[in-house]
Regions:
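An anionic, glycine-rich sequence signature occurring as long contiguous blocks
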Residues: 112-203, 208-209, 299-308
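Short, conserved catalytic/metal-binding motifs centered on acidic residues
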Residues: 8-22, 56, 91-101, 117, ...
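Domain-level cores of phosphate- or acyl-group-handling catalytic modules
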Residues: 65-129
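Electropositive, glycine- and tryptophan-enriched low-complexity nucleic-acid-binding patches
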Residues: 36-87, 176-177
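A short, flexible helix-boundary coil/loop motif
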Residues: 138-156, 235-308
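Short, solvent-exposed helix-loop connector elements
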Residues: 187-195, 210-227, 246-251
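Active-site-proximal, Lys/Arg-enriched surface segment
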Residues: 1-51
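Short acidic, glycine/serine/threonine-rich loops at helix termini
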Residues: 22-31, 104-108, 129-133
Length: 308
């Protein structure tokens, strides 16, 4: 991905995906339990995913056995799938999902990457204690129309590094979410605003599930699942590279991200009257009988002609 210019590796999101679709195999020793979106323990595949938040493309994906959120699992995943690909000096920020809440995980990411880490925090006993301390101080400020935020700085054990802890509360329901960042030089508002950069990994995982069949590995053994994930990653990178060389402005989002596979498939293949022939050069020739109102197919033809 880096060689073809579709990955920068500067701002990286780390996420975890629980695929309970194979929970019908509770007796299979290749599976272990994991909480799904509802918090219920199910037998599942649990890939961990690295995403480039700036270019909106996958960096790596790996099958995880055992406790996927344990410090040892995160260490193994990052050492084998992140730092062998991206030099820590290149990374400017890591955004972590709440599934990785834990002081050891945070300390590992901070020390190993030598960069700033921002994350949503699951409310375990320590986070709840910090939350109550922050709320008691009562130093709230408005954040949008429905929320208010408060913060305090804490010191991480072992490193002595300052960590800005933020409570975001819904003013109508009093529901709270917690966030944290090593960016103690940022205001709480700026930290929350910058955390949105992590969102592409959420839509990216949905794209992998819907268009690349991430949740449908051809088997239950770790080897087959790992191979499936590798093929999914290559397929997504191939499409991202294709979009980068085609440079079709009509397929760019307002954030200048390229469209997803389903958009390409619809524009090129859906509801099209076509004729397939062999031209004078002996090549297969696909002719769109309904024309090319958007000019996309003409641009694609020019690209393919150059690459013959």
């Amino acid at each position: 991905g880096r060689e073809f210019g579709v990955i920068e590796g500067k701002e990286i999101a780390v996420d975890y995906h629980c695929d309970p679709t194979d929970s019908r195999f509770p007796g299979d020793k290749s599976f272990s339990k994991s909480p799904d979106k509802n918090g219920d323990l199910v037998y599942a595949h649990r890939p961990q995913i690295l995403w480039d938040s700036i270019t909106n493309t996958i960096i790596n994906i790996a099958y995880c056995e055992g406790s996927s959120r344990a410090p040892s699992a995160l260490y193994k995943f990052c050492e084998q799938n992140l730092f062998k690909i991206i030099d820590p000096e290149v990374i400017s920020e890591i955004y972590a999902d709440s599934e990785y809440t834990g002081e050891k995980q945070l300390i590992y990411l901070v020390i190993r990457s030598d960069t700033n880490v921002t994350m949503c925090l699951k409310q375990n006993p320590k986070i709840k204690r910090w939350r109550e301390e922050t709320i008691k101080k009562g130093q709230w400020q408005e954040y949008g129309e429905q929320y208010r935020i408060a913060s305090q700085d804490v010191v991480l054990a072992e490193t002595g590094k300052a960590f800005r802890f933020i409570v975001k509360q819904n003013t109508e329901t009093a529901e709270t979410r917690c966030f944290g960042s090593t960016h103690v030089d940022y205001s709480p508002r700026r930290i929350l605003d910058s955390y949105r950069i992590r969102w592409p990994v959420e839509t990216g995982i949905k794209d992998l599930v819907e268009n690349y069949f991430l949740n449908n590995p051809p088997g239950t053994s770790p080897e087959k699942v790992e191979t499936h994930y590798y093929c999914v990653m290559l397929a997504r990178l191939t499409i991202d590279y294709f979009l980068s060389v085609l440079r079709e402005s009509k397929w760019q989002s307002p954030q200048e991200w390229s469209c997803i596979l389903s958009t390409i498939r619809t524009a090129i293949f859906s509801n099209q009257n076509c004729e397939l022939t062999i031209n004078d050069s002996g090549d297969l020739q696909l002719t769109y009988l309904d024309g090319d109102h958007l000019g996309i197919k003409n641009n694609l033809a020019k690209l393919l002609e150059k690459r013959k």
